[in-house]
């Protein structure tokens, strides 16, 4: 049997108004409310009143009704709310079957905020006295009623029974034994105070007050057993002692800053002592010499030490690591600066890096002596620097072009032309012309680039020795670079190289003069051997043939496509809807379960499940 839901929303406004009057007590004439269904089974307020007995007698025996009342229990001024659900046996069967569920709906949403809930099925369940006792028990403690009730029985009980029982035997004993009464009183009086004291001890009135223990300041101590084994090794203690010891092999415990400061202090003290000893020796040796001039080396050394002392007073002392870092930084700045300013920058850095040279410039007498020494040191590194400029064309890295000699300024300017920031990604002229020549010599049969031979003949002869005078060891790795270059690009690059290399005949001038003679017949032999199958004899150039073989296979590959086996309707915007036997092309396997494809008929692109289709290729 289906339950019949209750309809309390149609007249919910009227029910709410009457309910607020009962709960809030704004209207003294309305202390209870009963809602009952009408002919359309819509619940609405049927009756209201102010008497609790009238409330209990107003329920209809043929309907399922619900009532709420505000009652003040006896002995209390606080009103309590009682909710009554009336379900008589004479009500319709379907309504009675759904009474439990509907009563919960009424109690939670329609008439909430009650103190007591009562379910009544006949008049015996609506007994006024029983309901009032339930309400009074729910109201809590009633102190006024308890005080009034306790005072009456205590007075009546103390006046009736105990007086008769106590006084009759005591009077008889005292009258019968008047002489012996003097002996027992002290005996009886002594135990009385003792018993009182015992009672007080039992009541714990003399116990000290309990204090709360703060476990943070006064924590509990571990209870150790009294048994202590003798002769047993405590492994934990031994391990803790071993781990607490520092390993002398470790140096991490030493503070590097403190160690460096200590070494600086010791070296400073040592230098000061040496200076003082030298000054004392000079003073003591001057009268013994008898006016002769002291050795020049000692004077220079003393003057240098004085300059060092002045420099240290004016500037804070720097560690060797700091001096090396400054020197390295300045060298990097020199390599990045212009070539014309490199020479003065190097001399300037040498003056700044030397601790003694900065202040020697201020002393007129020492200037001429140290300039001679500085000139010797400056002239010595010139040959290796000049050798580096000679080998510039053979080096790929642009960093080696940064330190030219003074004699080769125009040559270095021409070499560094293509290495401006805009041309960093381009190849060097000397390198690029070699690679196409060797490629054409080796790959004439495969590539068939006979059209590039005329520009090779037009290359000026003095430039050729420079190209082949470069080391031939790095040629095999270079063969792999120009393979993807097209013919048109090679011709344009060769023309640019001819223009750049024409005004630079000075580079091959340092190479041996007889080198061009054996190279000319080599070119003729290469031209003659071009039609001959010379490639198989050289096994060093295998990459080009596999590239040619792979190229025709790429256009033959077809994009994956599939045929739908079932109809599928998209569940989201990024999915694809298709019918059975539809063709899906351009499939991308983004996942094992979901693929990305394009519908051939409409061109719509989206995701679809892989188990709905069958791949065609």
UniProtKB/Swiss-Prot annotation:
GO terms for biological process: regulation of actin filament polymerization. Residues 340-351, 359-375 have a biased composition (Basic and acidic residues). It is found in: Cytoplasm, Cytoskeleton. Residues 169-223, 325-574 are annotated as: Disordered. InterPro entries: Abp1_fungi_SH3_C2 (IPR035718), ADF-H (IPR002108), ADF-H/Gelsolin-like_dom_sf (IPR029006), SH3-like_dom_sf (IPR036028), SH3_domain (IPR001452). One of its GO terms (molecular function) is actin filament binding. Residues 437-453, 483-502, 516-530 have a biased composition (Acidic residues). Residues 202-600 are annotated as: 3 X 10 AA approximate repeats. It holds the Pfam family Cofilin_ADF. Residues 495-538 are annotated as: 2 X 16 AA repeats of E(7)-A-P-A-P-S-L-P-S-R. PANTHER family: CORTACTIN AND DREBRIN, DREBRIN-LIKE PROTEIN. May be involved in the spatial organization of cell surface growth. An overproduction of ABP1 causes the assembly of the cortical actin skeleton at inappropriate sites on the cell surface, resulting in delocalized surface growth. This is Actin-binding protein. It comes from Maudiozyma exigua (Yeast). The lineage of its organism: Eukaryota, Fungi, Dikarya, Ascomycota, Saccharomycotina. The gene is ABP1.
